[in-house]
């Protein structure tokens, strides 16, 4: 990694080529310690990144020794001062110093010295690029100032430009144009050199540079000295310290930019690559623009970048220069974040004719140039298009807001419509269920109306044979005997209709009188069933008594009611069963709202716990718990942040066995106080003084509620923003317009406790002035004077919550009713389960025996059972069988309603909420009885009592329907929740639909394969189209990758990395994908390099 810079010391002669050095024999390997030490020195000189250092450190000793020998073989032979001295010698008046002239100028002319200067610069560039970092730092230090010397020589090499401008004015242009080296050089100024401003930040030549030196400089500029100088600067900038030095130099970047006036397109391309890389470093864009401002002053341009555009238009024979120029223009315009500044820079080049020239280059054959042009066009910022997009966006946003409002309105309407349809379906399901019950009752009565039916009802229904009609005489005698004993009643209708009614009371208590029979018989069926039953017999038999005497009899003889309830089924008794529909007794109905029979439970206790220990003697102290007195301390003590237990909470705990007073007597508490007293203490006072002070202050301060509770009450009252009298008056009149529901719920927490009521009563008894109380205490005093305050607050909360709660419960009950009844009444579902049972028995009966049913969770197993080829499941096969053999069952899921909604309902919670509403309505009725002049309660009861009745009826129907359908499918309603039960059917229907779609897709694919085999195969797409598609995907993928717009120069090698990245892919901003997609003309995709291909 060293340099072969030895030629700088070789004498200049006709045969100046350095002699070849013989191969150095390999030295023996030193000891391990010395080897590691020398290897560490070599690594420090190589200036490698940490990952490479770690990799080389893992080498074995043989490889380490080889690396040490290689590095020592290429030792640095010339110090930086040798190169600096030679560069300074070329800057003398005659082009070389006297000392150097005496050594090697005697036999050489000036051109020979120019060739040697180029060789020196090449060796300097190699040294800067390959030597260790210490060599570069020595070249750039304050003593050598190598950067200043290099820039001065670069300015000297470019002096021929000014000389050419002067010679252009005095010499015929035709002779100049005939020179091959001047064919690509343009006039550097449109104005005479005298018009160029003198104040420019460049390297100025001293008066010592004579006219002869300028002519010599022209010869220098025709060589590669400028190009190699730029390479040297690039090598310096590749180091972090060197880059900082270059960026902070007042004229370095300016001289690099002025190198664009060189005649070589290769040099200009190198300069533009370096300037483009500097643009992408943080803070570099401003320095580049300042350098081109200086270029404008030096070269006399009317507009900035004018000469650059002239070179771009006329150097069309050198593709590398055009690619570098296009890349620089793209970066200098579009690498800034300020959009307005981007538009300004973009317009500068548009004004110079860039857009028109790019239109001419659109059909260029160079892929590299086309990619750079397309990258610029993708980054172009079209203000007109953005304005249109802004207007369109505003219109779209307004339209989107309107659509959102419409969606919200439609969603609300859809929810209301769904709830209405759910209610209607639930009502229709209830009517359908009632109609089926009535139909079953009519069928039973019709079967009983025949003699066969009458004789069949006396013994057990299933065991009596039909031929019993051959003995009618004995049967009639038996019936008459039972009727005489009061066990049955014969009801004769019109024609030959005869019905037999069992008297359960007589069967349960044979010795009872006949007056109990009608009472029990009317109590056994429900009210809805007793009315049509009483209307069916003809007038001669006495009808059963109405329900009102039944309720009266229940109130008169409450002890006898429980033993009369068990005989209701009547199935195990010898007498025949009654012809009434239904075999199971209905659940006991809730107590009616209008009756005053059983006393309702008292309202819940008011919130708030028992009083504190200090004032809570009496009822709050548990049995066996001794009251404790507060302890007076000599010093002020800090508070221990614990959660204390109340006396009522320690019963049966370990605390009942503890005696802390005994411990206090045994310990030295004075020492405890000395160690734990607070820092802010007054003088030590005795207990008597404290008691006297407390007794003096006590009369001046009265507290009715605890401090934290008073603070929370104050916050609540501020939220209500109402006075105490206004609040209490609204509570007394049930004014929900004044008191919001949220405020009521907050205020419920501050109902006076028993302890607070005792303090309030003591305060009023002593007739103390109100000024002693705080605002919160005065409110509590006024608040506690309200009659039946807990009942009123509960009633107010109920009045405010009832409409929303009822509106929330209704759809849930309807969903349960509709889903339960639709599942139970679906014949298609029953037939599908029948098919599933058949498949299961067919598969399992030989090993496990035949099954008579299955649990509903077994439906999930249909998806798990795979076929032999593992391509389909049992559910897919079931779908195929149903589609082929039972097409009428394919739409079975349309019979099942609201499964998902019913599955999300917690029936126990809903029933609990309904019962809570019922208790709240009863409380409201009692309040209205006590205060019948309240129009608010009267209007509420009138408007919402029907709603409550409907809720009660629907809750009972929902519970019965759900239990019925769960039991109907062999499940236990106590352990099966609606979420489990309905989710089984919901999952099955969804899986069935998905299986239907998959089977249909398989059919289409099979048909396509069949038709494909019949038709000739179509030729595949050519590989070229495939490659273009992959290139397009690669290009889109590249555009989606957000590269950083600005690089950091905080490491060595940053400039080389930036230049390499720009060569691999063009500079495209991440925010230009959409705009370029709209602007790009239709056609084949851009060719992408192999580095970007997928």
Curated annotation (Swiss-Prot):
The keyword Transmembrane helix does not apply. Myristoylation mediates membrane localization. Highly expressed in the spleen, lymph node and bone marrow cells. Residues 27-464 form the GBD/FH3 domain. Residues 627-1018 form the FH2 domain. Residues 1-29, 173-199, 507-627, 1002-1094 are annotated as: Disordered. The modification Phosphoserine is found at residues 7, 184, 688, 1021. It holds the Pfam family Drf_FH3. Plays a role in the regulation of cell morphology and cytoskeletal organization. Required in the cortical actin filament dynamics and cell shape. May play a role in the control of cell motility and survival of macrophages. Interacts with RAC1, PFN1 and PFN2. Interacts (activated by RAC1) with SRGAP2 (via SH3 domain); regulates the actin filament severing activity of FMNL1. This is Formin-like protein 1. It comes from Mus musculus (Mouse).
């Amino acid at each position: 990694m060293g340099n072969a810079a030895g030629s700088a010391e070789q004498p200049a002669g006709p045969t100046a080529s350095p002699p070849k050095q013989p191969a150095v024999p390999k030295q023996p390997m030193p000891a391990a310690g010395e080897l590691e030490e020398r290897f560490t020195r070599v690594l420090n000189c190589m200036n490698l990144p940490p990952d490479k250092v770690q990799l080389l450190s893992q080498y074995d000793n043989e490889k380490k020794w080889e690396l040490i020998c290689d590095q020592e073989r290429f030792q640095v032979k010339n110090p930086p001062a040798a190169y600096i001295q030679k560069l300074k010698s070329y800057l003398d008046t005659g082009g070389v110093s006297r000392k150097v002239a005496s050594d090697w100028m005697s036999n050489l002319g000036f051109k020979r010295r120019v060739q040697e200067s180029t060789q020196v610069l090449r060796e300097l560039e190699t040294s800067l690029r390959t030597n260790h970092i210490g060599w570069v730092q020595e070249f750039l230090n304050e003593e050598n100032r190598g950067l200043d010397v290099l820039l001065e020589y670069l300015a000297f090499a470019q002096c021929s430009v000014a000389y050419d401008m002067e010679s252009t004015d005095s010499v015929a242009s035709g002779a100049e144009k005939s020179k091959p080296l001047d064919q690509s050089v343009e006039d550097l100024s449109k104005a005479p050199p005298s018009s160029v401003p003198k104040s420019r930040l460049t390297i100025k030549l001293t008066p010592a540079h004579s006219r002869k030196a300028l002519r010599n400089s022209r010869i220098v500029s025709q060589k590669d000295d400028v190009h190699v100088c730029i390479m040297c600067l690039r090598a310096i900038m590749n180091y972090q310290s060197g880059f900082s030095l270059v960026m902070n130099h007042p004229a370095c970047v300016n001289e690099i930019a002025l190198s664009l006036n060189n005649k070589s397109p290769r040099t200009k391309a190198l300069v533009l690559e370096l300037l483009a890389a500097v643009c992408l470093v943080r803070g570099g864009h401003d320095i580049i623009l300042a350098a081109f401002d200086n270029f404008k002053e030096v070269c006399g341009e009317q507009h900035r970048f004018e000469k650059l555009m002239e070179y771009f238009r006329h150097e069309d024979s050198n593709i590398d220069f055009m690619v570098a120029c296009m890349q620089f223009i793209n970066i200098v315009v579009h690498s800034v974040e300020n959009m307005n500044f981007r538009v300004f820079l973009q317009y500068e080049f548009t004004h110079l004719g860039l857009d028109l020239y790019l239109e001419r280059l659109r059909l260029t054959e160079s892929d590299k140039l086309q990619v750079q042009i397309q990258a610029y066009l993708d980054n172009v910022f079209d203000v007109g298009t953005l304005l249109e997009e802004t207007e369109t966006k505003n219109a779209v946003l307004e339209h989107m807001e309107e659509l959102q409002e419409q969606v919200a309105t439609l969603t609300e309407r859809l929810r209301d419509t769904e709830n209405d349809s759910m209610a209607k379906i639930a009502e229709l399901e209830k009517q359908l269920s009632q109609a089926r019950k009535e139909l079953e009752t009519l069928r039973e009565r019709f079967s009983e109306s025949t003699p066969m039916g009458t004789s069949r009802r006396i013994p057990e229904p299933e065991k009596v044979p039909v031929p019993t009609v051959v003995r009618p005489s004995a049967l009639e005698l038996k019936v008459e005997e039972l009727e005489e004993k009061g066990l049955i009643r014969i009801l004769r209708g019109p024609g030959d209709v005869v019905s037999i009614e069992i008297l359960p009371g007589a069967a349960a208590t044979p010795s009872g009188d006949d007056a109990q029979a009608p009472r029990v018989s009317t109590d056994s069926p429900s009210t809805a069933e007793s009315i049509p039953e009483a209307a069916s017999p003809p007038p001669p038999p006495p009808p059963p008594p109405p329900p009102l005497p039944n309720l009266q009899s229940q109130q008169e003889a409450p002890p006898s009611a429980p033993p009369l309830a068990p005989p209701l089924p009547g199935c195990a008794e010898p007498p025949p069963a009654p012809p009434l529909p239904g075999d199971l007794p209905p659940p006991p109905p809730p107590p009616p709202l209008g009756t005053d029979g059983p006393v309702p439970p008292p309202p819940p206790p008011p919130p708030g716990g028992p009083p504190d220990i200090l004032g809570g003697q009496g009822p709050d102290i548990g049995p066996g718990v001794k009251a404790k007195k507060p302890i007076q301390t000599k010093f002020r003590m800090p508070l221990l942040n614990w959660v204390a237990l109340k006396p009522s909470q320690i019963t049966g705990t370990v605390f009942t066995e503890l005696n802390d007073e005994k411990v206090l007597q045994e310990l030295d508490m004075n020492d405890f106080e000395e160690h734990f007293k607070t820092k802010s203490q007054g003088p030590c006072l005795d207990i008597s003084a404290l008691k006297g002070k407390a007794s003096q202050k006590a009369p001046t301060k009265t507290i009715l509620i605890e401090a934290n509770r008073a603070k929370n009450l104050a916050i609540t009252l501020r939220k209500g923003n109402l006075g105490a009298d206004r609040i209490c008056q609204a509570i007394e009149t049930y004014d929900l317009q004044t008191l919001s529901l949220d405020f009521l719920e907050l205020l419920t927490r501050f109902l006076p406790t028993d302890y607070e009521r005792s303090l309030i009563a003591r305060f009023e008894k002593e007739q103390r002035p109100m000024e002693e109380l705080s605002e919160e205490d005065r409110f509590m005093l006024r608040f506690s004077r309200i009659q039946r305050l807990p009942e009123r607050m509960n009633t107010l909360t109920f009045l405010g919550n009832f409409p929303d709660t009822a509106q929330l419960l209704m759809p849930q009950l309807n969903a349960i009713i509709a889903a339960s009844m639709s599942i139970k009444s679906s014949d298609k579902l029953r037939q599908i389960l029948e098919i599933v049972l058949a498949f299961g028995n067919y598969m399992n009966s030989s090993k496990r025996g035949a099954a008579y049913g299955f649990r509903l969770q077994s439906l999930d197993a249909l998806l798990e059972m795979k076929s032999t080829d593992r391509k389909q499941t049992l559910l897919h096969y079931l779908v195929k069988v149903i589609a082929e053999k039972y097409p009428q069952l394919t739409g079975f899921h349309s019979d099942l309603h609201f499964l998902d909604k019913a599955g999300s309902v917690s029936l126990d919670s809903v029933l609990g909420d309904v019962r809570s509403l019922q208790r709240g309505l009863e409380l409201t009725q009692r309040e209205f009885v006590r205060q019948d002049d309240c129009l608010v309660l009267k209007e509420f009861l009138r408007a919402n009592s029907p709603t409550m009745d409907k809720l009660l009826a629907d809750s009972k129907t929902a519970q019965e329907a759900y239990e019925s359908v769960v039991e109907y499918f062999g499940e236990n309603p106590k352990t099966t929740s609606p979420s489990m039960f309905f989710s089984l059917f919901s999952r099955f229907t969804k899986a069935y639909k998905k299986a239907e779609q998959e089977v249909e897709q398989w059919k289409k694919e099979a048909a396509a394969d069949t038709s494909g085999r019949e038709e000739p195969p179509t030729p595949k797409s050519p590989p070229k189209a495939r490659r273009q598609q992959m290139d397009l995907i690669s290009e889109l993928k590249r555009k989606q990758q957000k590269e950083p717009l600005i690089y950091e120069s905080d490491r060595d090698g940053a400039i080389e990395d930036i230049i390499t990245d720009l060569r691999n892919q063009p500079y495209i901003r991440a925010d230009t994908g959409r705009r370029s997609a709209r602007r790009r003309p239709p056609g084949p995709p851009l060719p992408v390099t192999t580095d970007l291909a997928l």
